[in-house]
Amino acid sequence: DIGALPELVGITEKDGEIAIGALTVHRTLQRDAIVCRALPLLAYSAAQVGGGWQVHNRGTVGGNLVAMHPLYDIAPVLLALQADVEIQAPEGVRRAALGKILAETSHGLGTSSLLTRILLKPMTPDAGWAYEKLKITAGSYGSANAAAVVSLNGNKLSTLRVVIGAVSEQPLDASEALHGLLGKPWDAAAGARVESLCRELPKTLLDDQQGDATWRRAMAGVVARRAVQAAVANAQRTNK
């Protein structure tokens, strides 16, 4: 039982990096001053976690990650924020990109390792962000979700990161597939391109009571387009 380890709880900021203890609960992510200021996408998405106040007050960011449940909310957001993780093992401490850890077998930690911290850079002041989630009821798991981070040069996309969750066993980072939109203006045609590319991105799809595979493929494109559209609008408001 690691629940009584105080060093795994809390949020700090030092030398331009934010460290979040693995046992920090979702409610803290929603309300912490550092997270709300520097990582507003994470604060917002933590409030969208299903299960009500019990899960928000007891569920932890580390548990959310290592459970590797495909319908959970936090992993796509942390991937869009380019998070690293710190892992403690008998041979020492290592740091790795979250995307690398998630891509490894299971959660990539092994039986003798422990996720201790999530490490992130603050979002840039000009960044726009959004988290879109489709779900059947207010407290249910998501059927499809997407996190987006953008920055603009005028009306042209200079940064575009999109990660789609709840449609496949693993979150899908669409950023490379959407690379061709960088330097292009955001308009209806760009939105249609995001939807088309992200709809075709999943190789295998979940098929369960939250939605069948055909519906999920369609919704992967929809949530991605909506997330980018909302993130662009956010960036435009921020930079007025």
Q: Residue locations for each model-derived region?
A:
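C-terminal structural segment of proteins
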Residues: 1-240
